[in-house]
């Protein structure tokens, strides 16, 4: 047994699915599956995830897309209403919506979250985003000016404090630079502890996460390099040391699998050959608009031309056995709690994951059972 397998045996890994709330999921390619988002599609995906024992489903928010031949992310559902619908048709899986904090006041978000907590019987949590793509907000007159790029996490810190006050005590009197609460009330409060996700990778984002969040989401890096994200987790561990809070990292990967390594690689090369260069160029322009942040932000990685066909997220390409082994390596990085997965073809990809990949994973034996993993 490999050292990675030994480690994975001792460290159970949580797995979530990043559901495709926007058209075409996460592939900017004319050669990838082309589809519109719908409640029905996301319901099928989330129910499959629940069936296969996945731990959570997360939806993003995107208010304006990248255009191009594939009209990438020009078509998007809204996160809270989607997750409320999914909460009503699921029974076990945890659900996370994303709050566009420039659009929604924190007291309203706190109440929406409490409502979905009620629908789901305590299975709901929240992902907070500051907003990095100016046109998403300027189109509705809500962009606060480009100086906001340098103040995003000061704004988000006040926002999160209002949420925590309301969820934990039922009232907030915060008087800050961005928000002024006047005996603001919330009832009923959530029945379960409300968990917060943040995906900040800059120094300011890490400091925010270590102070206010429960989970940090970060990008995997490279193709078939499942531990290359380790320096990002190390930076969070340093930030956590200053706050003393328990925050774990979850890593985003795209899974492209097939019966053989060669077949999976051919699929990946085919997607890259059809890259939507117009949409990729738009992504690069939006990334360059933020001149206030450093080189360590998510958008800097997304816009890198190296593998922009899937916004440079970590990609695991191979046979079912290869992908299972690569995923088991992820959890060997100290501070890693799990992974967030996307697929080139979500319905088939989830079936393949649930029936052919997960049973081979040492880090998922708490889900599949020891005997099944050994037989496979």
Curated annotation (Swiss-Prot):
Catalysed transformations (reactions): uracil + FMNH2 + NADH + O2 = (Z)-3-ureidoacrylate + FMN + NAD(+) + H2O + H(+); thymine + FMNH2 + NADH + O2 = (Z)-2-methylureidoacrylate + FMN + NAD(+) + H2O + H(+)
Domain of life: Bacteria
SUPFAM superfamilies in the cross-refs: Bacterial luciferase-like
One Pfam family recorded for the sequence: Bac_luciferase
Role description: The FMN-N(5)-oxide reacts spontaneously with NADH to produce FMN. Requires the flavin reductase RutF to regenerate FMN in vivo.
Record PANTHER family: ALKANESULFONATE MONOOXYGENASE, ALKANESULFONATE MONOOXYGENASE-RELATED
Full protein name: Pyrimidine monooxygenase RutA
Protein's organism: Methylorubrum populi (strain ATCC BAA-705 / NCIMB 13946 / BJ001) (Methylobacterium populi)
């Amino acid at each position: 047994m490999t050292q990675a397998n030994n480690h994975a045996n001792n460290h159970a890994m949580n797995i979530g699915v990043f559901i495709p709330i926007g058209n075409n999921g996460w592939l900017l390619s004319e050669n990838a599956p082309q589809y519109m988002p719908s409640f029905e599609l996301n319901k099928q995906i989330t129910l499959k995830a629940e069936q296969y024992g996945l731990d959570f489903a997360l939806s993003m928010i995107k208010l304006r897309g990248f255009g191009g031949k594939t009209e990438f992310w020009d078509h998007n559902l809204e996160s809270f209403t989607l997750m409320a619908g999914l909460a009503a048709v699921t029974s076990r899986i945890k659900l996370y919506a994303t709050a566009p904090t420039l659009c929604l006041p924190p007291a309203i978000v706190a109440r929406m979250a409490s409502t979905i907590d009620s629908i789901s019987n305590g299975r709901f949590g929240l992902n907070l985003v500051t907003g990095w793509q100016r046109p998403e907000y300027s189109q509705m007159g809500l962009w606060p000016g480009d100086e906001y790029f340098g103040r995003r996490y000061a704004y988000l810190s006040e926002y999160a404090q209002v949420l925590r006050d309301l969820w934990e005590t039922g009232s907030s009197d915060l008087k800050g630079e961005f928000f002024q609460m006047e005996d603001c009330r919330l009832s009923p409060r959530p029945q379960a502890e409300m968990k917060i996700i943040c995906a900040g990778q800059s120094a300011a984002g890490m400091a925010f996460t270590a102070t206010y969040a429960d989970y940090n989401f970060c990008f995997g890096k490279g193709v078939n390099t499942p531990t290359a994200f380790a320096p990002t987790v190390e930076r969070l561990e340093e930030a956590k040391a200053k706050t003393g809070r328990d925050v774990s990292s979850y890593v985003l990967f795209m899974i492209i699998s097939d019966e053989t390594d060669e077949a999976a690689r051919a699929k990946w090369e085919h997607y890259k050959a059809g890259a939507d260069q117009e949409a990729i160029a738009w992504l690069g322009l939006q990334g360059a608009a933020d001149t206030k942040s450093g080189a360590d932000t998510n958008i800097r990685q997304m816009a890198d031309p190296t593998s922009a066909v899937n916004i440079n997220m970590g990609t695991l390409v191979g046979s079912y056995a290869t992908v299972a082994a690569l995923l088991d390596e992820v959890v060997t990085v100290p501070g890693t709690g799990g992974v967030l997965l996307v697929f080139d073809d979500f319905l088939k990809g989830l079936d393949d994951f649930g029936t052919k990949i997960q049973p081979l994973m040492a880090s998922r034996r708490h889900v599949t059972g020891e005997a099944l993993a050994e037989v496979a």
